[in-house]
Amino acid sequence: MILSDKDIFDYVNSKRVLIEPFNSKFVGPCSYDVTLGSEFIKYKDDVYDLKKSLSHNKFEIENSIMICPLNHHLDETIIKNYKEKYNVNCVVSGGLLGTTNEYVELPNDVCAQYQGRSSFGRVFLQTHQTAGWIDSGFKGKITLEIVAYDKPVILYKNQRVGQLIFSKTLSPADTGYSDRECSKYAGQKSVMASLIKKDFEIDEEE
């Protein structure tokens, strides 16, 4: 059962669901809009070896970032020109991890799903790849996997990037996400790189 706008207000006001900060203007008919934070991660590895720690740079923007497609040629001169012409803080190409401003806490009988905005899809910008599902009992900010597929796209801090759709489960989970020992991203308050190397099935193969 998907929560309507009335349900979302009820769950937030009764503190069954925490969204911090909460903006009543961001409540849709059956969703809640979330906004882009200022912290990002860019991987440095030539190959993603998922049994090892992934090398990355974590950085913060003041206002805006230009995201270019993977094969878009960038050098120091082009980056400088883009920054001056479009007044952006940062220019990157390829995939990028970001995070929402919103910190969310779900009870054990509510799960959620993140969906990117349709307006972003219309400029071929995707803000999540496969990680749109949020288990019941989750606590933390939502990590975004951002890719531009056509032309460079400029994103701005605090703009709405997607929405959360909340669903009521038939019964509460015995153990919520943040209470499971194997949950790698419980309580995340910033953008986090992949921790897939911690997967138990990988360890068992050693």
Swiss-Prot record:
Catalytic residues, chain numbering: E145 (proton donor/acceptor)
Site entry: Important for bifunctional activity: G132, W133
Biological-process GO terms, alphabetical: dUMP biosynthetic process; dUTP biosynthetic process
Biochemical pathway: Pyrimidine metabolism; dUMP biosynthesis; dUMP from dCTP: step 1/1
One term of GO molecular function: dCTP deaminase (dUMP-forming) activity
Positions contributing to dCTP binding: R117, S118, S119, F120, G121, R122, D135, T143, L144, E145, Q163, Y177, K184, Q188
Primary enzyme class: hydrolase
Keyword rRNA-binding carried by entry: no
Domain of life: Archaea
SUPFAM superfamilies: dUTPase-like
EC number(s) reported in the record: 3.5.4.30
Pfam families linked: DCD
Record's keyword terms, sorted: Hydrolase, Nucleotide metabolism, Nucleotide-binding
Catalytic activity: dCTP + 2 H2O = dUMP + NH4(+) + diphosphate
Cysteine pairs bridged by disulfides in the record: none
PANTHER family referenced in this protein's UniProt entry, alphabetically: DCTP DEAMINASE
Physiological role: Bifunctional enzyme that catalyzes both the deamination of dCTP to dUTP and the hydrolysis of dUTP to dUMP without releasing the toxic dUTP intermediate.
Assembly, per entry: Homotrimer.
NCBIfam families per UniProt: dCTP_deam (TIGR02274)
Record-stated family: Belongs to the dCTP deaminase family.
Protein name, as recorded: dCTP deaminase, dUMP-forming
Organism field: Methanococcus maripaludis (strain C5 / ATCC BAA-1333)
Classification lineage: Archaea, Methanobacteriati, Methanobacteriota, Methanomada group, Methanococci
